[in-house]
């Protein structure tokens, strides 16, 4: 039996080599599952041929990378990027923001899956919890959608100000308290998590949190209004969808105004703005950005997979 040796908090451990675990890590680099398992079987055969009984994770990764570079350089690059992120000592907190309909939920799910992050939460869920705790009288804005929050304003703003954005900012300020609580808890517990939603707006989450090296924020945009509107038609035609298309279309003008505001906030605060047209391209952009700005290297304390 081939044993793989790793290290956790300075203590070494060994576990049996698993083709399934290795294959799963390869699928995170976008290798087809069947092909990944076949490749993992070849790695196992290679180790047996060389009569390897014990191998460190680092040595195994080097062998896998060498074989990948010969077979598929593109997958090899993605695999090494994934490995680099996995080696981060601290929990990884990824924040993905953007106006309704730009695809934050879909991208968050794919990014979490690619990185092997088990925890993901929508800011809409955080807002829903807050609704159960705080009454409508105290925080009327959170009982509205992000694009209708202006309707809850008790005092109408001056004509020269944009009431949609004033309502939206009030809405985001309230929900950001819940978002900050989730981030703080994840950091305390050492849990990696992806948080997505319209309430992830640069400038609204405490700087001491977003400036941490292991916290990364991204904003998604869709410049073409017709493409953006088409996303709502696509979303609402699903059988499980419960959100009425008519409501989105009726307030599309407000959604686009919020879209521009979030994008401007991102550029103002130096947050990466990603045009979300192609899912694969968007995910690759996020992964590459993480390796450049967030991951500083070093073995992750709880690393236990190939």
UniProtKB/Swiss-Prot annotation:
Its EC number is 2.7.2.16. Pfam families: ATP-cone. PROSITE patterns: ATP_CONE. GO terms for molecular function: ATP binding; kinase activity; phosphotransferase activity, carboxyl group as acceptor. It catalyses: (2R)-2-phosphoglycerate + ATP = (2R)-2,3-bisphosphoglycerate + ADP + H(+). InterPro entries: 2PKG, ATP-cone_dom, P-loop_NTPase. Keywords: ATP-binding, Kinase, Nucleotide-binding, Transferase. Residues 1-90 form the ATP-cone domain. Its cofactor is a divalent metal cation. It comes from the Archaea. Pathway: Thermoadapter biosynthesis; cyclic 2,3-diphosphoglycerate biosynthesis; cyclic 2,3-diphosphoglycerate from 2-phospho-D-glycerate: step 1/2. The keyword Kinase applies. NCBIfam families: PRK04220.1. Belongs to the 2-phosphoglycerate kinase family. Catalyzes the phosphorylation of 2-phosphoglycerate to 2,3-diphosphoglycerate. Involved in the biosynthesis of cyclic 2,3-bisphosphoglycerate, a thermoprotectant. This is 2-phosphoglycerate kinase. It comes from Methanothermobacter thermautotrophicus (strain ATCC 29096 / DSM 1053 / JCM 10044 / NBRC 100330 / Delta H). The lineage of its organism: Archaea, Methanobacteriati, Methanobacteriota, Methanomada group, Methanobacteria. The gene is pgk2.
């Amino acid at each position: 039996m081939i044993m793989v040796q790793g290290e956790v908090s300075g203590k070494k451990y060994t576990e049996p080599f698993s083709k399934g675990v290795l294959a799963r890590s390869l699928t995170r680099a976008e290798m087809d599952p069947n092909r990944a398992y076949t490749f993992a079987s070849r790695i196992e055969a290679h180790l047996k041929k060389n009569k390897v009984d014990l191998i460190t994770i680092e040595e195994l990764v080097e062998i896998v990378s060498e074989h990948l570079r010969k077979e598929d350089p593109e997958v090899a690059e993605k695999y090494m990027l994934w490995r680099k992120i996995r080696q981060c000592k601290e929990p990884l907190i990824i924040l993905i923001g953007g106006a309704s309909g730009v695809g934050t939920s879909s991208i968050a799910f794919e990014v979490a899956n690619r990185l092997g992050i088990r925890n993901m939460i929508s800011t809409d869920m955080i807002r829903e919890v807050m609704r159960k705790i705080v009454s409508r009288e105290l925080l009327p804005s959170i009982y509205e959608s992000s694009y209708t929050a202006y309707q809850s304003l008790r005092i109408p703003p001056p004509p020269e100000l944009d009431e949609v954005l004033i309502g939206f900012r009030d809405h985001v300020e309230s929900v950001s308290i819940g978002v900050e609580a989730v981030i703080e808890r994840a950091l305390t517990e050492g849990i990696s998590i992806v948080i997505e939603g319209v309430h992830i707006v640069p400038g609204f989450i405490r700087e001491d949190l977003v400036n941490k090296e292991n916290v990364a924020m991204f904003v998604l945009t869709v410049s073409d209004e017709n493409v953006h509107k088409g996303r709502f038609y696509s979303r609402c035609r699903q059988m499980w969808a419960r959100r009425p298309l008519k409501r989105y279309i009726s307030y599309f003008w407000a959604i686009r105004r919020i879209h521009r505001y979030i994008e401007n906030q991102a550029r103002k605060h130096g947050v990466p703005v990603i045009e979300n047209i192609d899912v694969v391209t968007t995910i690759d952009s996020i992964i590459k950005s993480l390796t450049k700005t967030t991951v500083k290297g070093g073995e992750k304390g709880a690393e236990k997979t190939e």
